[in-house]
């Protein structure tokens, strides 16, 4: 697959982490990383999943032990959007227009994955700064 080919090239050029954000093509990225760590168990290779927690996709058995090469996954919490929309429909009726889902209303996030507690604390701090408006994230390319 194209994902596997691209990942092989990146990993052969000493890239350790790939955030695939490529839909089904990402399966090839996971496959390549798992194959490489099966051959070289001491090598630290990671894949960052997209849209949902892809931890299950990152599992690989090495010498009878399960290892996971999924570092984390970015999450589109579409269930929260559907729940919010449904509640609004029932309580207020349908109102056309754009609705934004973001960190403040749990519309997006990340899976804990294999992130350290220290990393998660830093991420939570930045998340709160974004929610509070101390850090501005553009909603369109600049």
Outline where the language-model segments fall.
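A residue-level marker of the well-folded mature domains of exported/periplasmic proteins
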Residues: 1-142
